[in-house]
Amino acid sequence: ESPVYVYHVTGSMKAFLDHYGYRWMLHRPEESMFHKQAVCISTAAGAGMKSTNKDMADSFFYWGVPKVYKYGVRVMATSYKDIKPKIKAKIEKDTNKMAYQIKKNAGHVKTGIKTKICFYFMRMLHTRGWDEADLAYWSKKGWDREKRPWKNNKGV
């Protein structure tokens, strides 16, 4: 979750996402992420929720997360106590609906074609000597050969 800050995530969220940059598919992805779901939530007094959620969703995609939910809400306030009850009720309803979907899909998410294509492209870079440390990780996992992180591992 991140409040909108100049149409993007806050500095602390950006630092968190950057800290895990080494887990991007190009480097050393955690195979359990290929079986998870993620939620991006952003709030703003005005606008910018879409681009803020995209910042977070991009990292989830490159971590291999197959299902990402996004929820942005204009709260028209700068503190929780100033949010109108009608908006709070809508948030409650929307997030309950999202939670239901997450529970329903738990253990059943599948890696999509876009992620698989991206993975194969990253694999091609590694087989051409992209980075020694990353290649050693991929090789240890068998991903430079026939194994794939979304197969035979529920990782939950």
Model-derived segments and spans:
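Helix-loop-strand module that forms the ligand-binding subsite of alpha/beta enzymes
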Residues: 1-72, 138, 142-150
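Glycine-rich phosphate/pyrophosphate-binding loop and the adjoining helix
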Residues: 66-156
